[in-house]
Amino acid sequence: MNCYLLLRFMLGIPLLWPCLGATENSQTKKVKQPVRSHLRVKRGWVWNQFFVPEEMNTTSHHIGQLRSDLDNGNNSFQYKLLGAGAGSTFIIDERTGDIYAIQKLDREERSLYILRAQVIDIATGRAVEPESEFVIKVSDINDNEPKFLDEPYEAIVPEMSPEGTLVIQVTASDADDPSSGNNARLLYSLLQGQPYFSVEPTTGVIRISSKMDRELQDEYWVIIQAKDMIGQPGALSGTTSVLIKLSDVNDNKPIFKESLYRLTVSESAPTGTSIGTIMAYDNDIGENAEMDYSIEEDDSQTFDIITNHETQEGIVILKKKVDFEHQNHYGIRAKVKNHHVPEQLMKYHTEASTTFIKIQVEDVDEPPLFLLPYYVFEVFEETPQGSFVGVVSATDPDNRKSPIRYSITRSKVFNINDNGTITTSNSLDREISAWYNLSITATEKYNIEQISSIPLYVQVLNINDHAPEFSQYYETYVCENAGSGQVIQTISAVDRDESIEEHHFYFNLSVEDTNNSSFTIIDNQDNTAVILTNRTGFNLQEEPVFYISILIADNGIPSLTSTNTLTIHVCDCGDSGSTQTCQYQELVLSMGFKTEVIIAILICIMIIFGFIFLTLGLKQRRKQILFPEKSEDFRENIFQYDDEGGGEEDTEAFDIAELRSSTIMRERKTRKTTSAEIRSLYRQSLQVGPDSAIFRKFILEKLEEANTDPCAPPFDSLQTYAFEGTGSLAGSLSSLESAVSDQDESYDYLNELGPRFKRLACMFGSAVQSNN
């Protein structure tokens, strides 16, 4: 009730503020002038409670009364109710001011209604009191059961968790008013889940009551009930289910299924071969069930175990090849342990599970065995045929010791005999092939299926059998104005023999060129040399080319020397002294032409091309004069209409060959109906084509057909035929229907179109005269 009075006071402040302002203004005015008005008594609204319970089933429920203190009960005032819900949810008695609720209300949908009230004097129609707001509050009743809004609930908790471990918290919600008594105060209880779980009554927190083992049961269903009104009689309740799953912890160690495993292995099996599998089981799941298999150190020389992490099996593999003749059985001990073991769970894994594995070696017929995995031999090049290279050896590892035969796979350079001795079958050249990669095959004599192969590498050693030579072809030029001591070329040499660090070349001029005073050579002692001029000035006309013989020797044993010729061209370098243009001049001079001759040849070529272009241009201009207009294509038959088509007859062209034939046979046929739109077009004729007799005969035949055709349409049409023509200067004739009347049209201009239109001019001229 106190809250309601406070709310009324706060809502009434805005309504009283104008009155307070008016009072203040009145007091201010009293200071300035004497009071003239009578003392007024303050009036206002009078009402009692404004509460209505929700879910009232009566059709009309009285809420309270609005009344003005000016109302003396003579029914002279009219009360009106305004705002949301007025007239639909709430009504007011216009005479008494009583307010009624005409609908069932639900506080959870709307708990407050703010309305406005007016009181009007019926006689004057004016408001007696200022419009006022008031609040109707819907009272709450316990009509909503608690609901769990976050369903479904699911929680995961580790197995073997201690008592009191928090699992999950469930929360229910009640739509009733929490400030109205105990309607929304909830109490939680456990309907299903004992004795492993418990729930706190006020918070809904679920906790573990006793330890649980996932291997016995991995999930539990717990049912929680929530009651409002703190569980008092008449309270409403709601329930929810919680699925609680136990997560696995590594509280179980792996154990072998068998205490003894028997496996076999062939002595021919290569290393890495899988011999068999062993298996242990673990009640845990996930990474807690991942295992690591191993072999005790004393037995791990020949065999090993790897773990297949997908199947959790131990795969026994061959670590080292076995020999039946040396040892035909083995015994090893394997153990298994978990891969992930937390420190707090080490008490469950103090001792690893073990098993014993017996492995039997199976005897097989083995191929020959070489003493070495590969052989490397060396031989000098240019050795004679049949020279010794080396010896390979293989034996039969079996007890019967079968004889061995040797062979070299795809080799035409080397031979091998039954003793494994390798010799050359051809001469060797290191510059052709420095290494030979071969394959030696050993085969048992009594069992040719037993074959072994190993690689054989033969290196051909170098001897000094190639003389040095120029590393490239040199184009050397010297200017006519070159001075003495000028470097004109740097040369280097190569040797096809094997390159060594101390490989060195020596450069000298030949005995014949030593006395030559034009050029000299200086050895740079780094396998290069420079060519220098030995005089000042050269003459291109007298001595255009010099040939110098250069001796290049190596430091091999024995030393080899070669003679190489360097060609030096004399070049007119001009004032710049540069030899960049010497190559072009050399090409010109090699053709035997001087510069003046080449210029003359170029001028002649330009004149010839100019004459050709001029001739082509004149021919093109003549063609343009013969055919000045190209507005249309040349055709054998040309039909042109200015109307929108004349039907199928537009596509029927005549054959010009028929016009030129001596005998013309034509059949009369009915003309198809065409549109009445007529256009005509005259064309220019270049006075070329068949003679007029042919056209005259053709036109007369067409005229005869038109005059005798009973199905001809009632309009004229003009068809123009041209022979290789390009148009007419006369222009287009107007359609006969384009004129408004014959009286408005003058056809005198037809007389100006020439003799070709004379007949047409006579026809229209006579028609005009007859009309006149």
From Swiss-Prot:
The chain crosses the membrane at residues 597-617. It comes from the Eukaryota. GO terms for biological process: adherens junction organization; calcium-dependent cell-cell adhesion via plasma membrane cell adhesion molecules; cell migration; cell morphogenesis; cell-cell adhesion mediated by cadherin; cell-cell junction assembly; homophilic cell adhesion via plasma membrane adhesion molecules. Expressed in many tissues, with the exception of uterus. Pfam families: CADH_Y-type_LIR, Cadherin. Keywords: Calcium, Cell adhesion, Cell membrane, Cleavage on pair of basic residues, Glycoprotein, Membrane, Metal-binding, Repeat, Signal, Transmembrane, Transmembrane helix. SUPFAM superfamilies: Cadherin-like (SSF49313). InterPro entries: Cadherin (IPR039808), Cadherin-like_dom (IPR002126), Cadherin-like_sf (IPR015919), Cadherin_CS (IPR020894), Cadherin_Y-type_LIR (IPR000233), Catenin-bd_sf (IPR027397). This is Cadherin-19. It comes from Homo sapiens.
